Amino acid sequence: MPKKKPTPIQLNPAPDGSAVNGTSSAETNLEALQKKLEELELDEQQRKRLEAFLTQKQKVGELKDDDFEKISELGAGNGGVVFKVSHKPSGLVMARKLIHLEIKPAIRNQIIRELQVLHECNSPYIVGFYGAFYSDGEISICMEHMDGGSLDQVLKKAGRIPEQILGKVSIAVIKGLTYLREKHKIMHRDVKPSNILVNSRGEIKLCDFGVSGQLIDSMANSFVGTRSYMSPERLQGTHYSVQSDIWSMGLSLVEMAVGRYPIPPPDAKELELMFGCQVEGDAAETPPRPRTPGRPLSSSSQTTQWSIQPGISRFCE
């Protein structure tokens, strides 16, 4: 039986005279956007939800600091604080991330330009993006509000997350990473429970992926991501690949399954291996403990262990 052709997503042009999130070419790009969306494999519910979000987004217009009313703080981390806000002109509730940066105007403008790539990242597994702007020393990134919060918040309340739910989390994260990789040549670079968001409709989406190289450099001198979720090759400062995102995803899933971070703190010898420098203190003083699953058996096995991490395409088969 032939596969049913999905219903195309219908997007109406924004009202005359309005700029969509500060980009005057938004209406010109509408046809191209529709074509890209039709390439995605969406079920009917996903299609309708994405269509509704993009239709709302067209009504937002240019984002300005005075147009927001703070409702509550959602969380802080990765160089910024996130607030639940009301966008008064449209009436939409958004999540607004504020990143304080003391940078030159040229760098600031480059960051805003690079963040515009997020306008093209439209997927059921990626948190929606309304726009970004600079005001009073802070970069504002305005996103879809996910009312269920992040999975690290869910984990704190629940203690651990059931296997059945983790299966759905795995599928959503893999599909989100695959979309970023295949459609936009983007690697996430910071997969962890706090960057996986959920909402009351049961959707699971990724946020805070590294699209702006200049923002990454400005925030952390080219060292981005949470160390405890980084793959071994990242800790050593070597190449970054999609396998590094897979490592971080796996570590996050184990943490959510057992209810705690799965790897004990490294001893002095392990720190020396990871960072290539001597650590003060006697490594022999550290009491022996069982090897955590996933850790190398010995230093000689490191290169082989780390180099065989599976590519993301294998998980989608």
Question: Can you annotate each of these PLM segments?
Answer:
Residues M1-G61:
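Intrinsically disordered, low-complexity regulatory segments that flank or precede the catalytic domain
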Residues A132:
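Activation-segment/catalytic-loop signature of the eukaryotic protein kinase fold
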Residues V169-S170:
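Activation segment signature within eukaryotic-like protein kinase domains
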Residues I71-N78, V82:
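Protein kinase glycine-rich loop
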Residues G137-S150:
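Conserved short submotifs of the Hanks-type protein kinase catalytic core
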Residues V93, L98-C121:
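Conserved N-lobe beta3->alphaC-helix segment of eukaryotic protein kinase catalytic domains
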